């Protein structure tokens, strides 16, 4: 079931990259004059004290575009809602799934994979369960260095 390894985040370092629009059609001559800088921490980490990253293992979320080897940024300060992709601690393991709250009034919630080859987990009131955080960003490496 476990399909994510939680890692501590060191968001104190500054990673600044030159920003350039990536055009899928014809490039604009005005792009030569853009000099905005991307600060990963400023632009993507809203709650540094509550943010972590996770290494994704497995393919249970592949139909959501999350693949084995990806990294996700998890924010524990964000409130999960129905349909959120969450990292949950359930029965002693971390797992990443869609949170389905449609049956909450009936006493259970569901953790839904984004791959039909995996089962839906029904989480009952007495289960050892916690929504540990909400997945807010995905990082994928296309080219290995």
Where do the PLM segments sit?
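Short, positionally conserved secondary-structure boundary motifs
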Residues: 1-62, 93-94, 108, 129-132, ...
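Charged, well-structured alpha/beta interaction segments
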Residues: 63-64, 72-73
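Hydrophobic beta-strand signal
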Residues: 73-74, 87
């Amino acid at each position: 079931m476990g399909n994510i390894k939680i890692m501590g985040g060191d968001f104190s370092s500054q990673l600044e990259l030159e920003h350039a629009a990536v055009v899928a059609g014809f490039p604009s001559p005005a792009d030569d004059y853009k000099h905005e800088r991307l600060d990963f921490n400023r632009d993507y980490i809203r709650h540094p004290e509550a943010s972590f990253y996770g290494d994704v293992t497995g393919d249970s979320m592949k139909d959501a575009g999350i693949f084995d080897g990806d990294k996700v940024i998890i924010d524990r300060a964000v409130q999960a809602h129905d349909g959120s992709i969450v990292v949950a601690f359930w029965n002693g393991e971390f797992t990443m799934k869609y949170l389905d709250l449609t049956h909450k009034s009936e006493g259970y919630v569901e953790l839904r994979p984004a791959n039909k080859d995996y089962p839906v987990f029904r989480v009952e009131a007495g289960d050892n369960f916690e929504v540990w955080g909400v997945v807010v960003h995905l990082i994928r490496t296309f080219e290995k260095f």
